[in-house]
Amino acid sequence: MLMPKSVALLRIRYTLEAALARGFTTVRDCGGAEGFLKAEIRQGSLNGPRLITCGHAISQTGGHGDLRSGALPASAFDSCSCHFGQVGVVADGVPECYKAAREEFRRGADFIKIMGGGGVASPTDKISNKQFCDDEIKALVDVANSYHTYVTAHAYTAEAIQNCIKLGVKGIEHGNLLDERTAELMAELGCYLTPTLVTYKVMGSDQFSAFLGPENSRKNTEVLYKGIDAMKIAQKKKVKICFGSDLLGPLYGYQTQEFRIRGKVQTTQEILLSATVTPAEMNGLGDKLGQIKPGFIADLLMMKSNPLDDITILDEPESNILFVMKEGRIY
């Protein structure tokens, strides 16, 4: 059941303030956050991380961003908006892809997010599906290039990832089923990988397993156990890795568990780089964010102890963060 937009708006203040309190001074949103939120944060009406947003994620009909049930024809949904979520929009064919991407930029998007393959939570696709035709992806990339920014793609399989990055996509979200050749290609093309391992762990737990139906749970299990292996491959092939979580709504509070999970694969320094320097570079902010240096924006955390010695302290922000500084202001 979709959350009413009015309820989502009521929860935004808490979500933003809680993320900042956990130490996240910048957050990249890959579907749903609108431009007005960035403006309110900049103006000080809301306390929260600065936002880097894509607006809505763009999906093909029947793709990961299409929330319509497969039990009814598309015409059954024409007279209502009950099937529209806050996360995605649907576009088919090159003209619609041009228009959808330009509309997101018109509304203040910083980059474009597409659904390049099947997903766990979507009702009518398989994870193995490759989504969008080549000319559609190329159209979306061309629009992003004209705005001097990038396209990132939701994709799990090696086939979907390779298809996207060969057409100019510069970011891959999730990537749980990539193989060595795919990782090599990502490294060669300078493509960024953002694993979201905590999502599958939380959704697979007894506490939240009821959120997914039987088929969606099966898909979640499939990607859960292969995500760590994919990260090992990406690390070995020197793919640029960013920190991510992909948690929605009340689950967002679990985002710091990603630090603990990544400790199984990455060194503490590599994990910290994935949450600071590398994503700043990905988003064209490498000369402003991610480091404590003269001329950089004054974002920093004051900790009780050194996360380089124990990365898991970042998963316990309430007891380990003394204060969060964003743009020189202490929160």
From Swiss-Prot:
Belongs to the metallo-dependent hydrolases superfamily. CDD domains: Met_dep_hydrolase_A. This is Uncharacterized protein YJL213W. Pfam families: Amidohydro_1. PANTHER family: ALPHA-D-RIBOSE 1-METHYLPHOSPHONATE 5-TRIPHOSPHATE DIPHOSPHATASE. It comes from the Eukaryota. One of its GO terms (molecular function) is hydrolase activity, acting on carbon-nitrogen (but not peptide) bonds. It comes from Saccharomyces cerevisiae (strain ATCC 204508 / S288c). SUPFAM superfamilies: Composite domain of metallo-dependent hydrolases, Metallo-dependent hydrolases.
